């Protein structure tokens, strides 16, 4: 977001497995530069509904807590005029965000991460284990994506701007 910082949204599909850990597949990646927290909240809520998400995990450390303040409030989508309801916080042990709950609240739509050194170490270890066991899948290479896209009529008919926008997630990973 703000102060020259970039906001990243990674959309993962989590597929439960009969045995062992779920398979996590990166579906898409979105990036915004220097957006106001309210604009970020609107963008995240749009993606939440577009992908029928179960949970939005938000980095609530530092400036991230400002984003949370907008996520727990309603917004009107400036493009569609639709109400984007407030998001409830799943791990609100202190009950701080319960006071923002309304009849329209998207219950437990957010999980807040407030990382510290021990959590960072645990997360790093977990991700390394998941990567080495093939439980996390990323997008295909940018060149492979471009070849696949250009082999379709849709891809061939896209102008350069639309093609670049389509390929952006593959470029970023």
What do these predicted regions represent?
Residues 88, 93-99, 105:
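Generic extreme N-terminus detector
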Residues 21-24, 52, 100-109:
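Short acidic (Asp/Glu) and glycine-rich catalytic loops that position anionic groups and cofactors
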Residues 106-130:
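Conserved RecA-like P-loop NTPase helicase motor core
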Residues 1-93, 121, 125, 137-173:
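RNase H-like, metal-dependent nuclease domains and their acidic two-metal-ion catalytic environment used
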């Amino acid at each position: 977001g703000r102060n020259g910082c970039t906001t990243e949204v990674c959309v993962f599909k989590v597929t439960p497995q009969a045995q062992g850990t779920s398979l996590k597949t990166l579906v898409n990646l979105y990036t915004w530069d220097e957006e106001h927290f309210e604009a970020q909240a609107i963008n995240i809520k749009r993606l939440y509904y577009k992908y029928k998400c179960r949970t939005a995990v938000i980095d609530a450390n530092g400036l991230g807590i400002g984003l949370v303040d907008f996520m727990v409030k309603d917004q009107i989508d400036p493009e569609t005029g639709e109400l984007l309801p407030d998001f409830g916080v799943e791990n609100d042990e202190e009950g701080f965000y319960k006071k923002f709950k309304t009849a329209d609240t998207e219950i437990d739509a957010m999980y807040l991460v407030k990382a510290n050194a021990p959590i960072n170490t645990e997360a790093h270890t977990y991700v390394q284990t998941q990567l080495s066991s093939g439980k996390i899948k990323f997008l295909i290479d940018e060149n492979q994506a471009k070849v696949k896209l250009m082999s379709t009529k849709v891809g061939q008919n896209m102008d350069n701007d639309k093609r670049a926008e389509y390929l952006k997630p593959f470029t970023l990973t």
